[in-house]
């Protein structure tokens, strides 16, 4: 079981930021990644639809024999994290709490902002997570178009900057000094987001902290792979493999082979 892959799921390409962090911190672990690009972005979808899509794909990953699941999508974590942990015998790691812990440790004035998809913000997953952090004042803002821009490979330019300034203005007015990127797509917008918020604001991505959680949980369950060679990774998408591969190279580097990306058909029905 220790040599079984880690299963990673995201609505599209954003979870590749988490995959990259895991590859960097745990180079001996094999990854099996599925991006539901045919149905991205998840943000505008009802939580029930997100739950059904997520569990359909995570069911398939567990059936393939992964030793751990990483739900590398904030919207999916908000929709069905509890369901997934009750449903599967393998450990399930998510991306919300790691980002919250980092933000609490980072803020200097106690004012933290969170941006995410409409589904993530509506779910109040971050509001609930921050309740255990006394002294933190939380401000949130939905950024419904960001994930779609990233999925289309548009991560800079005047249009994206203007959108960011409009979305983030309430958080600037709230004087936040720490901004949680509550969607794994958003690290590709770091340049635009930093410009819109100013250098005095620290941006927090969950990717690095999630990778630390993966290491901790694998260690606790005695599931760490032995470093005995180059692990085999698989990256798949429910939509166009070619489009996915092009965007994936921005996260994982130009050496990612296009033939490593296979189309995946997954039923959206789930119990």
Curated annotation (Swiss-Prot):
Pfam families recorded: Asp_Glu_race (PF01177)
SUPFAM superfamilies recorded: Aspartate/glutamate racemase
Recorded catalytic activity of this chain's protein: L-glutamate = D-glutamate
A molecular-function term among this protein's GO annotations: glutamate racemase activity
Binding positions for substrate per the UniProt entry: 10-11, 42-43, 74-75, 184-185
Task of the protein: Provides the (R)-glutamate required for cell wall biosynthesis.
Name under which the protein is recorded: Glutamate racemase
Species this protein is from: Saccharopolyspora erythraea (strain ATCC 11635 / DSM 40517 / JCM 4748 / NBRC 13426 / NCIMB 8594 / NRRL 2338)
């Amino acid at each position: 079981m220790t040599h079984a892959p880690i299963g990673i799921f995201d609505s599209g390409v954003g979870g590749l930021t988490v995959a990259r962090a895991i590859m960097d911190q745990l180079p001996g672990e094999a990854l099996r990644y599925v991006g539901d690009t045919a149905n991205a972005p998840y943000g505008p979808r009802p939580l029930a639809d997100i739950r059904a899509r997520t569990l359909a794909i995570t069911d398939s990953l567990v059936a393939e024999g992964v030793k751990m699941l990483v739900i590398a999508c904030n919207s999916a974590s908000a929709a069905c994290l509890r369901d997934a942990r009750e449903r599967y015998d393998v450990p399930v790691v998510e991306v919300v709490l790691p980002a919250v812990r980092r933000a609490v440790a980072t803020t200097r004035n106690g004012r933290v902002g969170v941006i995410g998809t409409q589904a993530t913000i509506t779910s109040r997953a971050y509001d609930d997570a921050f309740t255990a952090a006394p002294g933190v004042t939380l401000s949130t803002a939905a950024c419904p178009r960001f994930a779609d821009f990233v999925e289309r490979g548009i991560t800079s330019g005047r249009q994206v900057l203007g959108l960011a300034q409009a979305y983030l203005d309430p958080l600037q007015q709230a004087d936040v000094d720490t901004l949680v990127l509550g969607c794994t797509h958003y690290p590709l917008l770091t340049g635009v987001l930093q410009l819109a918020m100013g250098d005095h604001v620290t941006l927090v991505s969950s990717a690095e902290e999630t990778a630390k959680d993966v290491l901790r949980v694998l260690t606790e369950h005695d599931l760490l792979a032995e470093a005995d060679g180059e692990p085999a990774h698989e990256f798949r998408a429910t939509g166009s493999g070619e489009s996915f591969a092009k965007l994936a190279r921005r996260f994982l580097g130009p050496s990612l082979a296009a033939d490593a990306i296979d189309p995946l058909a997954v039923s959206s029905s789930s119990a």
